Amino acid sequence: MESVAAESAPAPENEHSQETPESNSSVYTTFMKSHRCYDLIPTSSKLVVFDTSLQVKKAFFALVTNGVRAAPLWDSKKQSFVGMLTITDFINILHRYYKSALVQIYELEEHKIETWREVYLQDSFKPLVCISPNASLFDAVSSLIRNKIHRLPVIDPESGNTLYILTHKRILKFLKLFITEFPKPEFMSKSLEELQIGTYANIAMVRTTTPVYVALGIFVQHRVSALPVVDEKGRVVDIYSKFDVINLAAEKTYNNLDVSVTKALQHRSHYFEGVLKCYLHETLEAIINRLVEAEVHRLVVVDEHDVVKGIVSLSDILQALVLTGGEKKP
């Protein structure tokens, strides 16, 4: 579900056309402040919601079959939404109990979601972060980045219903619909190297031979959503994302996490188009176009030999466009 309601938000008038590129640095910030979360909600969309009394096994299978990465959790006793069930929860459980002599992984999946949250996820438990449909998209971007989350439920304060799940991808796609209506800020023509957007130190990576269990530990420790897979020369050959981990549940192969990430990724080799890459000399505008067109969450920054130099994510892009006006994040 990546449809975006373009018709609900009128294109802004190009009233800044006489301004210089230098003075246009806040144009995207202004756009986000003048549009509400409601403007982005499609007229028709699919939303997966789980009751906390649902069996964990069924919940993760539903994530896979619906192609979603997370779902709001409804507590029937409290008559309210209490959190999100995400692939990160699945990873935390797998990593913590795979080598445990006390708990068998296959037993864990028989539990209800509420049991998981109360017993097994208490260390990583987070209260629900949500937003009103009347809040601005600027507030939504700020909340996503400040709380270091990837999904923000839009909840109607009057009915208590979840209307939509906002993500970095959907917000950037919405902005891209209107981007040609704006005077182009100077920073859009600057390179990644000039703007220093992205992460270039301590890049979390795995080798082609790295066991899945080790990769899960890196996800937990570094709190990243994807790991470039590199060969012996440091060249990127694949990418292992959190979303790939959910296939362990679908295929019931989570009882053998000692296989390599390369073997674990074979399930999608028939449709994998390759790692989406970019270079430090490319402009921010080119990077945004590639991210939106490919509908990916990040690009791997490489040199001319495909050696990994960094990662630029949707979060990095939105922070630069909306919160810091092209400047390096504080």
From Swiss-Prot:
GO-annotated biological processes: cellular response to glucose starvation; cellular response to nutrient levels; fatty acid biosynthetic process; import into nucleus; positive regulation of gluconeogenesis; regulation of carbon utilization; regulation of glycolytic process
Binding residues annotated for ADP 1, in chain numbering: M84, L85, T86, I87, T88, D89, V129, H150, R151
Modified residues (Phosphothreonine): T262
Residue ranges occupied by any CBS domain in the UniProt entry: 42-102, 124-186, 197-259, 271-328
Residue spans crossing the bilayer: none
Motif stretch (AMPK pseudosubstrate): 137-158
UniProt modified residues of type Phosphoserine: S260, S269
Binding site for ATP 2: R69, R151, K169, S241, K242, F243, D244, R268, L276, H297, R298
Tissue expression per record: Highly expressed in heart and brain, also found in kidney, white adipose tissue, lung and spleen.
Positions contributing to AMP 3 binding: H150, T199, A204, S225, A226, H297, S313, L314, S315, D316
Source taxonomy: Eukaryota, Metazoa, Chordata, Craniata, Vertebrata
A Gene Ontology cellular-component term: cytoplasm
Residues binding ADP 2, per UniProt: R69, K169, S241, K242, F243, D244, R268, L276, H297, R298
CDD domains per record: CBS_euAMPK_gamma-like_repeat1, CBS_euAMPK_gamma-like_repeat2
Binding, AMP 1: M84, L85, T86, I87, T88, D89, V129, H150, R151
Function: AMP/ATP-binding subunit of AMP-activated protein kinase (AMPK), an energy sensor protein kinase that plays a key role in regulating cellular energy metabolism. In response to reduction of intracellular ATP levels, AMPK activates energy-producing pathways and inhibits energy-consuming processes: inhibits protein, carbohydrate and lipid biosynthesis, as well as cell growth and proliferation. AMPK acts via direct phosphorylation of metabolic enzymes, and by longer-term effects via phosphorylation of transcription regulators.
Entry comment, domain topic: The AMPK pseudosubstrate motif resembles the sequence around sites phosphorylated on target proteins of AMPK, except the presence of a non-phosphorylatable residue in place of Ser. In the absence of AMP this pseudosubstrate sequence may bind to the active site groove on the alpha subunit (PRKAA1 or PRKAA2), preventing phosphorylation by the upstream activating kinase STK11/LKB1. The 4 CBS domains mediate binding to nucleotides. Of the 4 potential nucleotide-binding sites, 3 are occupied, designated as sites 1, 3, and 4 based on the CBS modules that provide the acidic residue for coordination with the 2'- and 3'-hydroxyl groups of the ribose of AMP. Of these, site 4 appears to be a structural site that retains a tightly held AMP molecule (AMP 3). The 2 remaining sites, 1 and 3, can bind either AMP, ADP or ATP. Site 1 (AMP, ADP or ATP 1) is the high-affinity binding site and likely accommodates AMP or ADP.
SMART domains named among the record's database cross-references: CBS
Positions of region (Disordered): 1-25
Homology family: Belongs to the 5'-AMP-activated protein kinase gamma subunit family.
Identification of the protein by name: 5'-AMP-activated protein kinase subunit gamma-1
Keywords: ATP-binding, CBS domain, Fatty acid biosynthesis, Fatty acid metabolism, Glycoprotein, Lipid biosynthesis, Lipid metabolism, Nucleotide-binding, Phosphoprotein, Repeat
